[in-house]
Amino acid sequence: IKFGESTAVLAGNSLLTMAFEILASPSLQISEKTKVNLIKKLSECSGHLGIAGGQYLDLSYEKKKISKSKIIEMEIKKTGKLFSFCCAAPAIIKKKNVKEIKFFENIGSDIGLLFQIADDLIDFKGSSKIAGKKTGKDQKKGKATLISLLGYMNAIQYCDKIILKTNKNLKRYGSNSKNIKETLNYILHR
């Protein structure tokens, strides 16, 4: 752990603002309308409906008994919304219909939820070397996680359900979805 949590937060904030800078750049070869749609979607995913809102819930749920649905909502906002944007952006650029864009947003939300739960699993039982940060912090702070609610093994089983659901949804893309399927397994088993 080289720089600490506060530096990591600042780096994350800087990277997020760089994303807006890139999307607004005149050198980005997409229509102005598409740029506006991407910036709007990224704003939704990073503001109170996304990352910032999820982080707020994370802090406000500490040391409280929180339902499974509220934990999932928090984790989707906290992490899933960013993955949602990443999966929806190509569909927005390709001018897909609203249904297709929503499909990819949902895939991204599930991938982000899986990533967040896997991150919580590493924090619970993993090493600082793998995590790249101190582990065991969630339990000490009384964080509301699926692990604290369901237990370690049940959280893993929930992740397996997310992977099965996502793979089923991606089936229509055949071998084109191979990399995503491999990534899902990597996320859980890293």
Task: Please describe what each predicted stretch is.
Residues I1-L170, K178-L188:
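Mg2+-dependent prenyl diphosphate-binding active-site environment of isoprenoid biosynthetic enzymes
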